[in-house]
Amino acid sequence: MRFIGSKVNLLDNIQEVIEENVKDDAHVFMDLFSGTGIVGENFKKDYQVLSNDSLYFSYILLKAKIENNSIPNFSELKKIGIKEPLHYLENEEFEISHEFFLTHNYSPYMGCERMYFTVENASRIDFIRLTLNRWKNESLINELEFAYLLAILIEAVPFISNISGTYGAYLKHWDKRALGKLKLRTLDIGNNHYANKTYNEDANSLIEKVYGDILYIDPPYNGRQYISNYHLLETIALYDYPEIYGKTGLRPYVESKSLYCQKKEVGNAFNHLIEKANFRHILVSYSSEGLLLEEEIESILKSHGLPETYRIYKMPYRKYKSKHKQEASELHEYIFYIQKDIALTNSVKSNKKIEVGKHKTNSYIKSPLNYVGGKHKLLNQIVPLFPDKIDTFVDLFSGGFNVGINVNANKIIATDINTYVVEVLDTMKKTSVEEVIAHIERRIEEYGLSKSNEEGFKAFRNYYNKTKKPLDLYTLICYSFNYQFRFNNNQEYNNPFGRERSQFSPALKKKLVLFIEALHEKNVQFVCSEFEHFNFSQLDQNDLVYCDPPYLITTGSYNDGNRGFKDWNRLQEIKLLDILDHLNSKGVYFALSNVLSHKGLENELLLEWSKKYNIHHLQHSYSNSSHNTTRGESQEVLITNYTNYTK
């Protein structure tokens, strides 16, 4: 949805600032003034995300898309016969009652003069809101399910609103789209396998209670209060029957006025925010026409951060509908960066009390494939737990090859059941960087691939499904939702278009080049095979088998058996554990990534088996309290049969 100050056009710039300055292994990204959540949603693929906004309707959008890692099941609704909640909410019949707040106050019903919605659409919105409240009160939907359905409604409302852009005023005649019927569309939910968290608090109060690695700050720039422009979305979200006033039916918002919109308060508020920020890396988006001057922001950042790390990036832009072209050309969007002298959040724990030395470098190569369950965020905890010297390293469930590419071994064998992924990696291994980049850029030009050309994307997807050329798959992924790959039961690529988010950006190109260059320097053999068919007899006591199988007690597209590839079940788990026992009897090293518990479930089979070996607890996700774990988090572990770790 359109939102004042949206950073959709600056996502690549933000990414590049992070790439240039964040050289350590950051895990936790916080978007403190999230709005509709476009920034947090974009970086959800790379980090555990904390998001916050003081507006409740924004908070609902965040909770639905950031905190949810999948589309909810609505199991309780199904028990009462409602299998498709959206269809029910769109089509169920109702009668207008005195409870229908929008109908009575924002549509031409019973003499009301306001024309924000037609009576048909206003009453449908009222029916949906009352129904969602009832379902929630009757425990038919939980908090995340409520947020998901309400977020869908909030995102649908602007398409049938009789406004020019914001809700500061309604049109005096009916716009064509306002006469259309309210349509509810499912949300695209990305899964990063982290316990993401959303907040609905004042930023300056919240900053004293949270911590992480990267803090992104995008405060209001001027005296314009967002609440007045989006008062109707706030009322729909809260549905609290406010005492409205004025011609446009504003809700009271004196207490909601942001300090960042007040000239006398903004300096102190920003200074407090930076001073209290318990984050190592801080990025600030601002504008040259904002209340704070560039020099003021620089001074505050340097007073609380490391002055030598200060950076400013200026992006010129044309002021929307400006009549003063010269003045508009001098406007800039800023991104400020500073580093604070604060440690990162990551740590390694071992129940055997084995001292783990720091790995030689904090810089790890990242796979260009956004593979579900990828271990890039855990590399700084996993790699130091590998033996000092490895002859042959077997990456038995290699996936996107995040682990194997970062291991020092005389020989690396990477196996995976997904033929298409193996072919992409093998092609990159056998092809020069120049040829790979040239191929990608040819396809981009040929199909007109961009963040907005969905038709070009679909045409290219159809072409790939007919030809199955490996580098075309990678190119396709670059323009797909969340940069992920997904196949149906016919093994056809079916991931949707990543509108306004995904593209082969300079930052992505840089990552790809680094990965291929590292790949060419290693002695790697890629093999498409099921794990039990690997020839383990070729291994001896100087070798290491690393296993990152699908997790038995979690669900994902990689282990549900519904994507044209073999599923993962208890029998598969037993086979793998038997193989590892056999390797141990031969004196061959192994390391197994897995989870002992997840969202209240325990892998009892693994818990019992692991007692024979060394269990190292990894910090997979982070709470915002003084404790390391919270209810519902995954207990991520690395299980090894050796103790001679990298020093």
Swiss-Prot record:
Q: Where is this motif: Adenine-specific methylase 1?
A: 218-221
Q: Where is this motif: Adenine-specific methylase 2?
A: 548-551
- E.C. no: 2.1.1.72
User: Keywords, A to Z?
Assistant: DNA-binding, Methyltransferase, Repeat, Restriction system, S-adenosyl-L-methionine, Transferase
The reply on keyword Aminoacyl-tRNA synthetase is: no
Any one GO MF annotation of this record: sequence-specific DNA binding
List, in alphabetical order, the GO biological process terms annotated in this UniProt record: DNA restriction-modification system; methylation; mismatch repair
Please name the InterPro entries in this protein's record: Ade-mod_methylase_MStsI, Ade_MeTrfase_dom_2, DNA_methylase_N6_adenine_CS, MeTrfase_D12, SAM-dependent_MTases_sf
Superkingdom, according to UniProt?
Answer: Bacteria
Keyword presence, ATP-binding: no
| Alphabetical list of Gene3D superfamilies matching this protein | Adenine-specific Methyltransferase, Domain 2 (1.10.1020.10), Vaccinia Virus protein VP39 (3.40.50.150)
Under PROSITE patterns, the record lists: N6_MTASE (PS00092)
Question: What catalytic activity is recorded?
Answer: a 2'-deoxyadenosine in DNA + S-adenosyl-L-methionine = an N(6)-methyl-2'-deoxyadenosine in DNA + S-adenosyl-L-homocysteine + H(+)
Q: What is the effect of changing residue 548 to A?
A: Methylates only 5'-CATCC-3' strand. Loss of methylation
Description of its domains: The 2 adenine-specific methylase motifs of the protein participate in modification of the two strands; the first motif modifies the sequence 5'-GGATG-3', the second motif modifies the sequence 5'-CATCC-5'.
The entry's family comment says:
Belongs to the N(4)/N(6)-methyltransferase family.
Assembly, per entry: Monomer.
PANTHER family, alphabetically?
DNA ADENINE METHYLASE
Q: What name goes with this protein? A: Type II methyltransferase M.FokI
Phylogenetic classification of the source organism: Bacteria, Bacillati, Bacillota, Bacilli, Bacillales
UniProt lists the gene as fokIM
